[in-house]
């Protein structure tokens, strides 16, 4: 396993946010973390990235305690992209991607041919060749996310953590970004991402971890986790689940509400 979490507990000002969280992330898989707003998804990702520290429990990366890694050493093994990262003013796409090589720099290891090769390769794999000399601020939502993902690729970490990479994107750009993330796992990287769209999660993720009220409500193969019962329970709403022709991916259809009550089918 690339990442193992054992009985993790985190509280904020005496209020429990995450309780007794345990799971493992297999190497080379795309694993999604889903759940309603405020359930602790983003907090969990910050704990796994080393941005925050849990009060109890253990996180292991490649068999070693996460806390044992020095900052740059951890960045060479694990890349973390927060939700809505801030672009530095006036930066070009190529310069943004170059930031991914920072963990590999040092007093005796300055910018070299390998760094330039990794940046070019990352831009090509994220299909940025035609825009890499543009201002990053001028990019569309989908292009901007692909630029951030290229930076992650240039970092060349085996484990990638992404916090809601498709938030605030329309369905076209969501698909564009999820296809790009899928390509990353196809290259052998392990990706753990927080994602709100359950249908997208079930279509693209290998496995899902569903969190409700700070605990794991379900986990396993993505299309087995996304069930009517789970959605009713976690999101306090009623849905119907259809299946897409061809691959059978779930299509989630919320039931209409009238005067605060869910309209139930006659059956």
Stretches found by the model and what they are:
Residues 234-267:
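ABC ATPase nucleotide-binding domains
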Residues 49:
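Helix-to-loop junction immediately C-terminal to a conserved catalytic motif
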Residues 34-36:
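The feature captures the beta-strand-to-loop junction immediately N-terminal to the Walker
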Residues 160-164:
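Catalytic Walker B motif of ABC-type/P-loop ATPase nucleotide-binding domains
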Residues 57-65, 74:
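Conserved ABC transporter NBD signature motif
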Residues 110, 135-139:
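Conserved ABC ATPase signature
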Residues 3-5, 18:
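Conserved structural motif at the start of ABC-family nucleotide-binding domains
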């Amino acid at each position: 396993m690339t990442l193992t979490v054992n009985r993790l507990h985190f509280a904020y000002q005496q209020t429990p946010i995450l309780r007794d969280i345990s799971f493992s992330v297999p190497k080379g898989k795309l694993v999604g973390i889903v759940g309603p707003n405020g359930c602790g998804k983003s907090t969990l990702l910050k704990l796994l990235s080393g941005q925050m520290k849990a009060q109890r429990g253990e996180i292991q990366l490649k068999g070693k305690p996460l806390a044992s890694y020095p900052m740059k050493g951890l960045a060479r093994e694990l890349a973390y992209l927060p939700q809505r990262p801030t672009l530095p003013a006036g930066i070009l796409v190529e310069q943004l991607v170059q930031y991914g090589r920072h963990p590999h720099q040092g007093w005796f290891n300055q910018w070299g041919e390998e760094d330039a090769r990794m940046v070019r390769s990352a831009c090509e794999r994220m299909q940025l060749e035609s825009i890499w000399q543009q201002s990053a601020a001028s990019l569309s939502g989908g292009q901007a996310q692909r630029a951030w993902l290229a930076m992650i690729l240039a970092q060349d970490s085996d484990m990638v953590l992404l916090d809601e990479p498709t938030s605030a994107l329309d369905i076209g750009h969501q698909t564009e970004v999820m296809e790009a993330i899928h390509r990353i796992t196809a290259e052998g990287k392990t990706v753990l991402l927080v994602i709100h769209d359950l249908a997208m999660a079930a279509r693209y993720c290998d496995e899902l971890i569903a969190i409700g009220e700070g605990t794991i409500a379900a986990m396993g193969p993505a299309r087995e986790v996304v069930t009517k019962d789970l959605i009713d329970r976690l999101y306090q709403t009623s849905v119907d689940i259809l299946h897409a022709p061809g691959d059978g991916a779930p299509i989630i259809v919320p039931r209409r509400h009238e005067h605060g009550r869910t309209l139930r089918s006659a059956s």
